[in-house]
Regions:
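Basic, glycine/lysine-rich polyanion-binding surfaces/domains
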Residues: 1-233
Length: 233
């Protein structure tokens, strides 16, 4: 087993190790290993529809963009076609979410290729004089999806307040890590945590969610769910 994450002198399993040990059948998405399923995509889809599923989103990358409020607002307006999200809001664009977590900070979460495009846009803006900067969070952040009719209750039980509107985002604290919480849909949440504490967060969600029927789900179940009538992802 690869023990890539370390705290002091002690080596800890990574979230990828835990996914494999949990039975994840791995496949490639944009050159990155992703859990396609945990035995049956059909069963996992039913879990997402009837209970609550937890997915480790190694198919997603994160990019943090920072700058004084006027500069960041102008950059986001230009990049998003006219309206920058207010603090606490997220905008869905080109398979990604642009989350304004503070007046001077935004986090973009999306597929690796989309995050790379955003990084290119930021670099171009900096070269043309914009007073903004970015941090590539590909090695320091982990994204988790909770989806299903019991997802909000699970977050509430875990101490992560789920009372956000769809498209609402807030920063919180969970399992020793700062945590971005985004409500993607009425029954779907995206969490972005420090990678160093991703295993702790994953385990805590599993422990809290056991009484709610929480199970691991893979990318195939999420893709099937997105293809259902009335769903956008």
């Amino acid at each position: 087993m690869v023990m890539a994450a370390t705290r002091g002198e002690v080596a800890w399993p990574t979230i990828a190790d835990r996914v494999r040990l949990a039975g994840g059948v791995m496949s490639q998405r944009e050159g990155h290993a992703v859990a396609a399923n945990f035995g049956s995509a059909a069963t996992e889809l039913a879990i997402c529809v009837k209970r609550v599923g937890l997915a480790v989103r190694s198919d997603l990358d994160a990019l943090e963009i920072a700058g004084a409020e006027p500069w960041l607002a102008h950059f986001l307006e230009e990049s998003l076609g006219g309206r920058a999200p207010a603090a606490g809001e997220a905008v869905r664009t080109a398979r990604s979410w642009c989350c304004r977590v503070a007046p001077d900070r935004a986090v973009v979460i999306g597929p690796w290729s989309a995050a790379a495009r955003w990084a290119g846009i930021v670099r171009h803006a900096v070269l043309t004089g914009a007073a903004i900067d970015f941090i590539d969070r590909s090695d320091s952040a982990t994204a988790l999806t909770l989806v299903g009719p019991r997802a909000a209750r699970l977050l509430d039980d875990a101490g992560l307040e789920p009372d956000l509107p769809v498209g609402g985002v807030r920063e919180s604290w969970f399992a020793g890590s700062s945590a971005l919480v985004l409500r993607e849909a009425a029954d779907r949440f995206l969490l972005v945590l420090d990678a160093e504490y991703a295993v702790d967060a994953w385990q805590e969600l599993l422990d809290v969610g056991r009484v709610l029927g929480l199970s691991m789900v893979g990318a195939e179940a999420l893709e099937r769910l997105a293809a259902a009538p009335g769903r956008i992802f």
